[in-house]
Amino acid sequence: AKLDFDRSKEHVNVGTIGVH
């Protein structure tokens, strides 16, 4: 789930879960 994680990271740039 690396791609999903990377995609989520960019999608959650404003509400990141501590993974900037």
UniProtKB/Swiss-Prot annotation:
Keyword Membrane belongs to the record: no
Main location: cytoplasm
Statement: the UniProt record of this protein carries the keyword Nucleotide-binding: yes
UniProtKB keywords: Cytoplasm, Elongation factor, GTP-binding, Nucleotide-binding, Protein biosynthesis
Compartments in which it is found: Cytoplasm
UniProt-recorded Gene Ontology molecular function terms: GTP binding; translation elongation factor activity
Annotated Gene Ontology cellular component terms: cytoplasm
Superkingdom classification of source: Bacteria
Function: This protein promotes the GTP-dependent binding of aminoacyl-tRNA to the A-site of ribosomes during protein biosynthesis.
Subunit architecture: Monomer.
Family to which this protein belongs: Belongs to the GTP-binding elongation factor family. EF-Tu/EF-1A subfamily.
Protein name according to UniProt: Elongation factor Tu
Gene name per UniProt: tuf
